[in-house]
A protein has these predicted regions:
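Sec-dependent signal peptide recognition
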Residues: 2-8
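Short, well-ordered, aromatic-rich surface patches in folded extracellular/luminal domains
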Residues: 5, 16-38, 87-150
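Post-signal-peptide N-terminal segment of Sec-exported extracytoplasmic proteins
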Residues: 38-63
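A short, polar/proline- and glycine-enriched secondary-structure boundary/capping micro-motif
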Residues: 42, 64-71, 129-132
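Residue-level detector of beta-strand structural context in well-folded domains
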Residues: 44-46, 68, 106
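A short, structured loop/turn motif at beta-sheet edges
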Residues: 48-52, 71-79, 110-116
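A short-motif feature that recognizes glycine-rich, charge-decorated loops
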Residues: 57-90
């Protein structure tokens, strides 16, 4: 009986690991979530994947509401990778805030090799993260997106 449980678990483990290899190109390089505030903050989610696809979901106070997709150029993709490579994952904080009560929350998820870093951005953000944020907004404006039906 124990042997059959072991075989089932081993089969599940191997099937999951083979699926992981097949989807490596769809893994996310960077995701950026812009949350709401008391004012008119833009609310959206942007993901840039290793297969160079961009997923955009506009939720509130943005020009494009709904889910969209496009492809990023090799140059822009390399620029994002370069900016991420400048971030010291071991020494960067996970939360940047201040004493202000109505701050616009942004969530930045960075992925590099086998490292992931989730950072909550409110205020007092270091320069290298501001550069990434600036590049994200540039990419949103730069590309034409295809609307995805729900």
């Amino acid at each position: 009986m124990r042997l059959s449980y072991f075989l089932i678990l081993a089969t599940l483990f191997l099937s999951c690991s083979s699926n992981r290899n097949n989807t490596s190109n769809n893994q996310v390089l960077i995701s950026y979530e812009s949350g709401s505030c008391y004012g008119k903050c833009e609310v959206f989610i942007l993901r840039i994947n290793y297969n160079k696809s961009i997923e955009y979901e506009g939720l509130k106070n943005v020009e494009k509401i709904g889910k969209y997709t496009t492809k990023i150029s090799v140059n822009d993709f390399n620029e994002i990778e370069k900016l991420i490579s400048k971030v010291d994952f071991n020494n960067i904080e996970s939360v940047y805030t201040s004493k202000s009560t109505d701050l616009h929350l942004r969530i930045l998820n960075l992925h590099r090799k086998n490292q992931n870093k989730k950072i909550l951005l409110f205020d007092n953000i270091p320069f290298e993260l501001k550069q990434i944020e600036k590049e994200v907004y540039s990419i949103i404006e730069k590309y034409k997106y295809k609307f995805l039906k729900n």
